[in-house]
């Protein structure tokens, strides 16, 4: 039997989206899972890890289709064995402290620090403290697993991913005899195989955003007042991601402060969003349904093109948001509907939106 078939889509109408429902994982459930992991015998690779999985995201065990969220626990004195994979990571320490080695670079982190691990980097984690260490680790591995191209190695050679210094980018159109050259006057070019397999090199480094430094800048946004129509956040930006505004090439990570009794304006976007609330309490309204949350809760808050907004209650809220917006920017698929009274826009390929910050 042949491993293919024809599917006749002649005249087929596009079906409406079947959005997966939001989900709130309560702090108690997370704490119980942390304690369960801590009570297990130490595994051979040192990784006490539990993936938080939405029941409807399919292959890859994601909380969203493209976003994997793992609870990672290290007891005092423990470490993980070195490994590498072709997925990238954003880590967030929610309890304790520790350090990580990424291609030989050491990052010492405290509670609520954020750091990145570029793909195919050799990394290991350490808990040199006398407290339990807990991290939320966000990975794009669910996307790679859906594509059946997730590759991982345990205990690879420690120097195998050493990065050469970024070379000066040369205008390939002037390279002979294998240059890239215009085919027509309207912008169509041809590129030879020699350039295809040797694209311009972009150096990706592990980056670290210490919470105390981030908070000092973030708290200044409280002064914007209740008339401000935007969101009081900072993107933890890696310039290597360029126009896709990423923390990695797949995700952005933002830290938001939501002053008490603030209700955001409803909006929607095709990118999925996962929020971790680490101070305060409030609620989100997604497709007309209200979801309550408080500090320590994890939420799939925007399952793609769902109309949603968030609100704080009687105290300030701090939250980490992971969103797959950079991936959509790179794909040219980032529809964003900031003002529901107007039209959505394809961000990155058209002009975007503006806030009223200059007037508040």
Where are these regions (language model features)?
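A short, N-terminal "cap"/entry segment at the start of jelly-roll beta-barrel domains
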Residues: 1-65, 161-250, 346-360
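Short amphipathic alpha-helical linker/capping segments at the junctions of internal repeats
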Residues: 112-114, 156-160, 281, 290-299, ...
């Amino acid at each position: 039997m042949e491993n293919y078939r024809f599917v006749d889509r002649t005249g087929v109408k596009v079906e409406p989206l079947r959005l997966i429902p939001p989900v709130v994982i309560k702090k108690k459930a997370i704490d119980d899972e942390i304690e369960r992991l801590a009570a297990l015998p130490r595994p051979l690779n040192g990784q006490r890890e539990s993936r938080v999985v939405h029941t409807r995201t399919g292959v890859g065990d994601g909380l969203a289709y493209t976003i994997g969220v793992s609870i990672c626990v290290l007891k005092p004195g423990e470490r993980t064995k070195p490994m590498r994979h072709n997925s990238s990571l954003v880590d967030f320490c929610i309890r304790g402290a520790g350090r990580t080695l990424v291609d030989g670079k050491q990052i010492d982190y405290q509670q609520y620090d954020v750091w990145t691990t570029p793909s195919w980097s050799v990394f290991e984690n350490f808990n040199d403290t006398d407290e339990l260490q807990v991290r939320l680790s966000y990975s794009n591995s669910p996307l790679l697993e859906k594509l059946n191209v997730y590759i991982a190695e345990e205990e690879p050679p420690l120097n195998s991913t050493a990065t050469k210094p970024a070379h000066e980018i040369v205008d390939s159109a002037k390279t002979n005899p294998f240059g890239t050259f215009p085919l027509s006057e309207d912008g169509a070019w041809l590129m030879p195989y020699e350039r295809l397999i040797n694209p311009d090199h972009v150096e990706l480094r592990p980056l670290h955003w210490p919470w105390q430094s981030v908070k000092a800048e973030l708290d200044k946004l409280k002064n914007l007042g209740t008339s401000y129509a935007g969101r009081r956040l900072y993107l933890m930006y890696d310039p290597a991601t360029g126009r896709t505004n990423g923390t990695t090439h797949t995700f952005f990570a933002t830290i938001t402060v939501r002053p008490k009794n603030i209700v955001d304006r409803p909006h929607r976007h095709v990118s999925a969003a996962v929020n971790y609330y680490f101070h305060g309490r409030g609620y989100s309204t997604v497709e007309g349904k209200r979801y309550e949350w408080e500090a320590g809760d994890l939420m799939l808050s925007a399952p793609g093109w769902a109309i949603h907004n968030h609100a704080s209650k009687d105290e300030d809220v701090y939250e980490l948001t992971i969103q797959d917006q950079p991936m959509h920017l790179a794909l040219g698929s980032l529809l964003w509907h900031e003002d529901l009274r107007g039209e959505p826009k394809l961000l990155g390929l058209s002009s975007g939106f503006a806030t009223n910050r200059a007037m508040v």
